[in-house]
Amino acid sequence: MDIKHNTPERDEFRATDGADVALWRWPQSKARPTLHWAHATGFHGRLYRPLLDELATDVNVLAWDMRGHGASAGAANVSTFRGWETYYRDMTALLDSQDEPVWLAGHSIGATTSIMAAARRPDKVLGLILAEPVIMDPVQGLKLGLAKLLRQSHRLSLAAGAARRRRVFDSHAAALDNYRGRGGFKTWPEAWLEAYVQHAFVPQEDQLQLACSPEWESTTFAHTEHNPWPGIRQLRCPVIALAAEHGSTFSPAAQKRLQTLLPSADVRVVAGTTHFLPMEQNDTVRDAIQQLALSGCREN
């Protein structure tokens, strides 16, 4: 299949609270395995088109816009938000909407959400490919859990920084110029930056406004999962976990503990990468997904 023709179409599924969550579908074929990709906080599914368009030649690709993000911005509701548990429930509802088991892959919160959904619906998940999952070791988790208990987690750097994020631009070109070479975007190839900007905004009169509001992004960071281990212990499917060499959200101590709990898991540190591993090492993520999703294997 020609990569140029791998254009996703919008679909949606109904979350348990009645909200509609956008789901992007690349061209599908019954003969191929299905893979769902879950994006990182503040982003959207079509950001990952440089990766997903390639994968769509071999697998049926799905990618949601997480609640409050991208085309699902309208599903944001702070009054009913229950931290990352809300996203876990949404992903579980997505799995329930599928006729057949699927492979789950994701980046950052998307990877962690995939873990929790797989733990809750083991019959619906064939395996996990995790790129920079947010998996804290017990010491990190204790500190964050205490900050959340004391209602101070909104002061943490990621949450505070997101709350200050610029939300309005005059044009897509102005947004590109603002992001290029700055902050977390420093290591992004141009194609990735363009894919992000293309679908990150909604019209606001004669300007553009971030679809994922700074308040929603900040709230999501403030509720970062501090104890994913009960879910990890329940996993029974194949797992590949890719960790960054620098500034990883999947610390060496957490890697060691996961490997102890899941001896068959394939844990790899990708040299030279940061938390934005999928953008920096697109081929590495693609190869890991193909290794599992095209293998036809499944642990029982």
Where are these regions (language model features)?
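Conserved HGGG/HGGXW glycine-rich cap/lid loop of the alpha/beta-hydrolase fold
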Residues: 22-76
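Active-site loop/oxyanion-hole signature of alpha/beta-hydrolase fold enzymes
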Residues: 66-105, 146, 287
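Post-His helix in hydrolase/transferase enzymes
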Residues: 279-291
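Conserved alpha/beta-hydrolase catalytic His-Asp/Glu region
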Residues: 163-222
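Catalytic histidine-centered segment of alpha/beta-hydrolase-like enzymes
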Residues: 270-282
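Conserved hydrolase catalytic core segment
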Residues: 100-144
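Conserved serine/cysteine hydrolase catalytic core
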Residues: 199-260
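Flexible "cap/lid" loop of the alpha/beta hydrolase fold
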Residues: 126-168
